[in-house]
Structures are given as structure tokens and as C-alpha cells.
Amino acid sequence: MPAWPEKRNYIGSHAKRIDAPANARQRARLGRLSPKDVPISELGGEKIEAVLTTAPGDGNPIGGIKVVTHDGWFAARPSGTEDVYKIYAESFWDHDHLRRIQQEAQALIAQVLQAAP
């Protein structure tokens, strides 16, 4: 992480979406994930603060999973129209931190989908 945390508010956030191939079985599994399916305690070098499968405001299912830290997050959800899943990620630090979040998110989702029945 950058040495100057106070600068994060001046730099702004960095975000990106990644698409990855997934068959129908894997997409269905991703849509049914629960917080207990996330076997990690850190993301991007930070403690995970929340693992969400429902929207905080209205409690509706988000159709995937969102993992949140103090300075970043990712959400993964299956596409409804293509044989892919999408990872949305954001870092409040920099592009390197964003890449780390993306890599760890991809590894986690690949691990979970590989175990799909």
C-alpha cells in the first residue's frame, strides 16, 4: 500500500471490470454463494470487513458476492446472457492495489467454482 494514506481522498478511486469464462453450472454456483464460501480473511493486504450477498439498503439478493475492505472491494456475479462471470473491483489507493484485489478475487472465485458440484 502507499506510504501516504491521507492522499487517498485526493487521488480518487481506481476501478475495473473483468470477464472470465464460466459454464452454466459455474454461473449457477456463483449466484448461490454465501459468506461462508469465502475462506479468506484478507483482500489486497487488508482485513475483510464484510462479505455480502444482499444489498445493504433493501436486503435484496445481489446475485453474487461482494467482499469489502476499508480501502477496496470486489463483487463477482454471473452474466445472465453470456458464458462468463464478471468481477467488478475498486481500490481507493492506486492501480497496483486494484490489480492485487483483482488477482486475489480471480483466484478466490476460480477456487470456489472449481469445487462446484
Regions found by a protein language model. Give the residues of each.
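Phosphate-binding and adjacent anionic-ligand microenvironments
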Residues: 1-117
